[in-house]
Regions:
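A short, Lys/Arg-enriched amphipathic alpha-helix from helix-turn-helix/homeodomain DNA-binding modules
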Residues: 1-22, 28-31, 52-70
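Short, charged low-complexity intrinsically disordered segments located at boundaries
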Residues: 8-12, 16, 41-45, 70-72, ...
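Hydrophobic positions on the alpha-helical face of helix-turn-helix-like DNA-binding modules
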Residues: 62, 75-76
Length: 98
């Protein structure tokens, strides 16, 4: 039987590691799957690629921090963006996609 992926726990782990570059392999290792197995499960269970899922997690948390009054520079750093402008561009892109 397939072991279920605890998506909320994976999201919490990812949030604690945003300061370092995360890739599909990092996420897959955390849930004891190969990168290709994880990619397949992510698309099936979350409806998006692992990197899309990770970006959505980062942006959701960034919006929470911004709404709480955190500055753009601090939010960008904590959410793992290279610069404040990279974060604002990502937020703008996401708003256009929804």
């Amino acid at each position: 039987a397939r072991r279920p992926i605890d998506w909320p726990a994976l999201a919490a782990w990812a949030q604690a590691h945003w300061h370092s570059p995360l890739g599909v392999t990092d996420l897959a290792d955390k849930v004891h799957l190969s990168a290709s197995q994880f990619s397949t499960r992510c698309r099936a269970e979350q409806g998006e690629s692992p990197m899309q899922w990770l970006r959505r997690q980062r942006l959701a948390q960034a919006r929470i921090w911004r709404a709480a009054g955190m500055g753009v520079a601090d939010t960008a750093r904590r959410a793992g963006y290279r610069s404040p402008s990279a974060l604002t561009a990502a937020l703008r892109r996401e708003a256009l996609d929804s």
